[in-house]
Regions:
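Short catalytic-site patches enriched in acidic/histidine residues
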Residues: 7, 11-20, 96-100, 137-190
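A composition/biophysics-driven feature that prefers long, compositionally simple stretches
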Residues: 1-127, 139
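Generic anion/oxyanion-binding catalytic loop in active/binding sites
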Residues: 104, 131, 171
Length: 190
């Protein structure tokens, strides 16, 4: 599992990203009949083990960072590649994301608790940014405050929309602009 979403799912919240907008992370999980493995480059291994998956029974399998094409050779030592698939087609394996996605649809109780806590933290971030907003602030300033309040709570905003006054009813997804707040504010965080 190489996508950020599947890696987070299989590791109960592990974060394999470097770039927020990348589909795949810098680590992948391989699960076989023989065991579970963390596939990553030599330069990413320390952070992933220390901060993301060290509590899990994943055996680290590393490849040189400058040879990402060498992963299939590493995989061949662990599994029969003719019977191995990937969520994203990583490492030249057949992609079966549609088959992986339903596995994430039903949440276990620890996942429900994490999502409830995330929702509460996100609400606090939005509320703090809105309370700090003042007439004359630009939508961009307010969006930056939402992002900063989110970051303080270990939340990475994927969507940070802000509209002031007449822009609220005009646009369904108002990207923040230099428009200044006069009276009314809309903020959306995902």
């Amino acid at each position: 599992m190489a996508s950020q979403s599947d890696f987070a799912w299989i590791t109960a919240g592990g974060d394999s990203r470097v770039a927020v907008d990348a589909r795949d992370g810098v680590g992948a999980a391989l699960v076989t009949d023989a065991g579970a493995y963390l596939l990553t480059s030599t330069i990413e291994l320390p952070r992933l083990v220390d901060e993301e998956v060290g509590r899990l029974p994943l055996e680290p399998v590393v490849y040189p960072w400058h040879e990402p094409d060498g992963v299939p050779a590493v995989l061949e030592k662990l599994t029969d590649l003719s019977h191995t698939v990937s969520d994203t087609g990583a490492f030249g394996l057949p992609a079966v994301d549609a088959e992986f996605a339903p596995l994430r649809y039903t949440l276990l109780e620890p996942e429900v608790r994490r999502f409830r806590a995330l929702g509460a933290d996100a609400a606090e971030a939005v509320e703090a940014a809105c309370r700090a907003a003042r007439p004359g602030d630009t939508e961009l300033d307010i969006a930056a405050a939402v992002a900063a309040e989110s970051g303080r709570r270990n939340i990475v905003p994927l969507v940070d929309l802000v509209a002031a006054d007449e822009r609220i009813g005009r646009y369904r997804h108002p990207l923040p602009t230099r428009t200044r707040l006069r009276h009314t504010l809309l903020v959306a965080l995902t």
